[in-house]
């Protein structure tokens, strides 16, 4: 985990995030056009999302369901009644010259999200970040600038309206975050929650998860907030952390040199690792919000709320707490296992099939994870089923095979070979009457090594154990072999 840059102790940062999550619906928020990513430019469009005269928007009911579920998962109060509003601004990627969003009556508000960081000793440090609001809105199109990554400096710009009208939820945090590390973890935990719910894939590289940061600094102990600066254009969690750490340093240096911090929007430049000024930050009055006249107010009934609440899965933080408290796993293992919902599902099927939880966690977070990373595979793409992993672990714990044998056969097991076939004829020799003659034979065949051992070179015990394992094709029970060899050498 990336460590945070040290901030001068006389100042503290006040940070909040505005996160846009694209909802995983098949069609757009107010029309029937596809939301599929990667289509040819301007093919997933229709008269509604283009704002042509004479057409009316109709709310996609799945959007409401997903937004409410997200609000519930974030411990928000769900509004019985809410409405849509028009947010007025002119930009080439906005075909209607207004965006349908929610202003004063959002679908959800007053929630919180728990984040977890590990200290130097691997112990979890937990903190609740307040959620101000969650609201539904439509996305804008996408601009592509030739010769630059923004309009300034480009030779010309192209616009793709496929994304216009794609459903989003915007989640606004309270200014409870204090470091870039906390901000990056908040964004990652938010993505985990959305993925567990199945309401968003959270792919930053496809624009399904986008974060804007609001940040100010103030002297420690001062209650009044400093001047807020917004940062955009962060395309990874590490970029979020680095942009915040840079901006904290920039603002502190400016204050200490007597400069005035202005309320503005700045862009993070990955290449130069700095923020640059983009524009003066707008206020809500600049957007001239008013109620959307073409959409009726939204009502969430008690029946809907009860149904959607009952469909919520166990969420990442809940799993982490259960794995630590009930299964005795380390904070590190619980983080790895709960990072991806399909990994946690694999783990839980394995222990339901009889696997020791700690052993299953070790195999999944170490050997299997290394294989997945190397092969660039998902855990659903390997041939080793959770039940077969449980079988392997049980064979080790009952002394039928050794851990070394299991690791040796792991590549074949991962491609689908069953434990029965993998370990046929490979059971450990754990009968002393069978092993003892082999130990005697090995010692008799190596008189020089025996003499050296008895003259004080006790490390040669490992040599004799290794020879026994070699003669038995590693089938000798390691623990029993060690005992027999030691008794014979010292006899």
UniProtKB/Swiss-Prot annotation:
GO terms for molecular function: asparaginyl-tRNA synthase (glutamine-hydrolyzing) activity; ATP binding; glutaminyl-tRNA synthase (glutamine-hydrolyzing) activity. Belongs to the GatB/GatE family. GatB subfamily. Heterotrimer of A, B and C subunits. It is an enzyme of class 6 (ligase). It comes from Nostoc sp. (strain PCC 7120 / SAG 25.82 / UTEX 2576). The keyword ATP-binding applies. It comes from the Bacteria. One of its GO terms (biological process) is translation. The lineage of its organism: Bacteria, Bacillati, Cyanobacteriota, Cyanophyceae, Nostocales. The keyword Nucleotide-binding applies. Disulfide bonds: none annotated. Its EC number is 6.3.5.-. Allows the formation of correctly charged Asn-tRNA(Asn) or Gln-tRNA(Gln) through the transamidation of misacylated Asp-tRNA(Asn) or Glu-tRNA(Gln) in organisms which lack either or both of asparaginyl-tRNA or glutaminyl-tRNA synthetases. The reaction takes place in the presence of glutamine and ATP through an activated phospho-Asp-tRNA(Asn) or phospho-Glu-tRNA(Gln). Pfam families: GatB_N (PF02934), GatB_Yqey (PF02637). It catalyses: L-glutamyl-tRNA(Gln) + L-glutamine + ATP + H2O = L-glutaminyl-tRNA(Gln) + L-glutamate + ADP + phosphate + H(+); L-aspartyl-tRNA(Asn) + L-glutamine + ATP + H2O = L-asparaginyl-tRNA(Asn) + L-glutamate + ADP + phosphate + 2 H(+). Gene3D superfamilies: 1.10.10.410, GatB domain, N-terminal subdomain (1.10.150.380). Keywords: ATP-binding, Ligase, Nucleotide-binding, Protein biosynthesis. This is Aspartyl/glutamyl-tRNA(Asn/Gln) amidotransferase subunit B.
């Amino acid at each position: 985990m990336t460590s945070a840059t040290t901030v001068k102790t006389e100042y503290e940062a006040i940070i909040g995030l505005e996160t846009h999550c694209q909802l995983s619906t098949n069609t757009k928020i107010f029309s029937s056009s596809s939301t599929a990513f990667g289509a040819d430019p301007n093919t997933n469009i229709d008269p509604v999302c283009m704002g042509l005269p004479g057409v009316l928007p109709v709310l996609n009911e799945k959007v409401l369901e997903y937004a409410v579920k997200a609000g519930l998962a974030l411990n928000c109060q769900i509004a019985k009644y809410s409405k849509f509003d028009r947010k007025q601004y002119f930009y080439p990627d906005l075909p209607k010259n207004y965006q349908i969003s929610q202003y004063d009556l959002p679908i959800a508000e007053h929630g919180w999200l728990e984040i977890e960081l590990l200290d130097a000793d691997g112990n979890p440090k937990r903190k609740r970040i307040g959620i101000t609001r969650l609201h539904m809105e439509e996305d804008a199109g996408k601009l592509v600038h030739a010769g630059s990554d923004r309009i300034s400096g480009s030779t010309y710009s192209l616009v793709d309206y496929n994304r216009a009208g794609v459903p989003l939820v915007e989640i606004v945090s309270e200014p409870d975050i204090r470091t870039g590390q906390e901000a990056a973890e908040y964004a990652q935990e938010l993505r985990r929650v959305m993925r567990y719910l199945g309401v968003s894939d959270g792919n930053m590289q496809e624009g399904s998860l986008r974060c804007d940061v609001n940040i100010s600094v103030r002297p420690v102990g001062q209650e009044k907030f400093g001047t807020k600066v917004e940062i955009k254009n962060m395309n990874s969690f590490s970029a979020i952390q680095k942009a915040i750490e840079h901006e904290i340093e920039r603002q502190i240096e400016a204050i200490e040199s007597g400069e005035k911090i202005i309320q503005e929007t700045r862009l993070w430049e990955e290449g130069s690792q700095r923020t640059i000024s983009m524009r003066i930050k707008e206020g809500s009055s600049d957007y001239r919000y008013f109620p959307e006249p073409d959409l009726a107010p939204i009502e969430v009934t008690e029946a809907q709320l009860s149904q959607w609440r009952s469909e919520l899965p166990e969420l990442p933080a809940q799993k982490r707490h259960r794995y630590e408290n009930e299964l005795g796993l380390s904070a590190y293992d619980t983080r790895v296992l709960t990072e991806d919902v399909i990994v946690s599902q694999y783990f839980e099927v394995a222990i339901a099939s009889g696997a020791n939880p700690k052993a299953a966690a070790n195999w999944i977070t170490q050997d299997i994870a290394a294989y997945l990373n190397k092969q660039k595979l998902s855990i659903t793409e390997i041939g080793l089923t959770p039940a077969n992993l449980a079988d392997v672990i049980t064979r080790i714990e009952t002394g039928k095979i050794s851990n070394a044998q299991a690791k040796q056969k792991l590549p074949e097991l991962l491609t689908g070979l069953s434990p029965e076939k993998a370990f046929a004829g490979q059971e450990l020799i754990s009968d002393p009457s069978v092993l003892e003659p082999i130990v005697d034979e090995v010692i008799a065949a190596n008189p020089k090594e025996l003499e050296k051992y008895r003259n004080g070179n006790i490390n040669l015990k490992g040599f004799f154990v290794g020879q026994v394992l070699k003669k038995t094709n590693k089938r000798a029970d390691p623990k029993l072999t060690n005992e027999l060899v030691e008794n014979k050498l010292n006899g």
